[in-house]
Amino acid sequence: MQQIQVNLGDRSYPIHIGLDLLKQQQTFQSLQSKKVFIVTNDVVAPLYLTQVKAALADCASVDVFVLPDGEKNKDLAHLEQIFSALLEKNYARDTTLLALGGGVIGDMTGFAAACYQRGVPFVQVPTTLLAQVDSSVGGKTAVNHPLGKNMIGAFYQPQCVIIDTQCLHSLPKAEFDAGMAEVIKYGIIWDAEFFLWLENNIAALKALDTQALTYAIAKCCAIKADIVSQDETEQGVRALLNLGHTFGHAIEAQMGYGNWLHGQAVAAGSVLAAKTALALGLLDALSVQRIENLFRAFDLPIDGPQSMAFSDYMRHMRRDKKVLASKIRLILPQAIGQAGIYSDVDEALLAQVINPS
């Protein structure tokens, strides 16, 4: 088992990465609470709930709340259902919430933990690649609103993150590929050598080779832990992690949450960011081609929806959380392994990138 530390003073926590961790009692023995409330969904529950409950049996009493699967259920109505379940059973602040699932479950459970009785501990147990390398680490918790993705939320750090690489063997191919979009993102914004490693290990990753997966997950978590330790609440360098997300969130909102997987939207958004950087003279054409080719290797889209006009993008992008002083801020790659934050990109240039004539 590998361990990576997120250093945030008295709120620091470990990320545990290994094979078959969910079957091992020692995985959960460090939990502070003797009462655990598991939040999961109706897809993950049949796969992993029994083994997690068995691993917890000797160290905590366990209750379970099962949500319907899907991004469309990441809303205030389903969040309220979690609160109602906790209140009806009189759970107090000595309860630990455990998020067993992908990014939707992790985001909702974390936000519920941040709000319930003004804050209770929670643990992230991500079961998708996207959640393992990105959303489970760093304390971003939220639900969606019809007018924007993740618009209602809080920064609230987990007690720990438990990543079992065996979970990836049950993922549908499209979900695995969507997770690779976030993996590739780390190479683009932060680590050119990792990007090259990804280019050279496509076959091993697609074959779910344990060693390759563990290396990639640990590398992503280490990068994110470093960034979050420097900038927990996204006042500076953490914003780089949003490469592709400004365009991507616009795609998700326009097409309806769940119709495009988050990773698919991030892939298309990252290519739009790279093309914007090319148009501005920040990035060379070969780097854009490498970015496109790596996303293509995992069957990810490199173009946004044909039905989506420039005006559709702009309507949603103006509501983006990174907007500052009414200016859209874009994360743009400057080279493979390096990115920056840019405001006031000319809208005529963006229009040409998004809908080239």
Swiss-Prot record:
- This entry's Enzyme Commission designation comes to 4.2.3.4
Q: Which GO terms describe its biological process?
A: amino acid biosynthetic process; aromatic amino acid family biosynthetic process; chorismate biosynthetic process
Q: Which InterPro entries match?
A: Dehydroquinate_synthase, DHQ_synth_AroB, DHQ_synth_fam, DHQS/DOIS_N, DHQS_C
CDD domains membership: DHQS
Any one GO molecular function term: nucleotide binding
Quote the function comment for this protein: Catalyzes the conversion of 3-deoxy-D-arabino-heptulosonate 7-phosphate (DAHP) to dehydroquinate (DHQ).
> What is the name of this protein?
3-dehydroquinate synthase
* Biological classification of the source: Bacteria, Pseudomonadati, Pseudomonadota, Gammaproteobacteria, Alteromonadales
